[in-house]
């Protein structure tokens, strides 16, 4: 690879690091080209799956301010640059790795810190953003109904107490 090509490649990878919300680093040793194409299709438009030389990726990561990943860049390495929600892409990679034992998840990077394999898998096990928002809305609605009941209870108790006192007074006046 010519020096100008390397400089261009490092610049492109640096931009991908900067533009992505998360990255997942994998080892693809033993995967066929068609299997890699299947993985790329399963990631969809929200992620780019790229194979690059480790030295270029290390340099690009340093240029992008991404730290703590150098030990992951050994052997045949491919990176999923995720733009948008990391859950769906991590889930697709985890599912693909389960079906294709040749793909090994090495780790990742999100929110300014390196992720272990277990953390990447935990992200993959999360439900999608829409499902989590729906659950949150349901919980909030239920809690609002409970809160409304709590706030209404003292007022209704005062009203019942006033009605009981009025009945008691009316009963005392009629008895006298």
Curated annotation (Swiss-Prot):
* A GO molecular function held by the record: large ribosomal subunit rRNA binding
Example GO biological process = translation
Give the top-rank taxon of the lineage listed in the UniProt record for this protein: Bacteria
Looking at the UniProt entry, the stretches that span the membrane are none
Q: Name one GO cellular component term.
A: large ribosomal subunit
Q: Which UniProt keywords apply?
A: Ribonucleoprotein, Ribosomal protein, RNA-binding, rRNA-binding
Q: List the cysteine pairs that form cystine.
A: none
Q: Which InterPro entries match?
A: Ribosomal_uL10, Ribosomal_uL10-like_sf, Ribosomal_uL10_bac, Ribosomal_uL10_bac_type, Ribosomal_uL10_CS_bac
Subunit (UniProt): Part of the ribosomal stalk of the 50S ribosomal subunit. The N-terminus interacts with L11 and the large rRNA to form the base of the stalk. The C-terminus forms an elongated spine to which L12 dimers bind in a sequential fashion forming a multimeric L10(L12)X complex.
Its family remark reads: Belongs to the universal ribosomal protein uL10 family.
Function field: Forms part of the ribosomal stalk, playing a central role in the interaction of the ribosome with GTP-bound translation factors.
- For this entry, the protein name equals Large ribosomal subunit protein uL10
User: What is this protein's gene name?
Assistant: rplJ
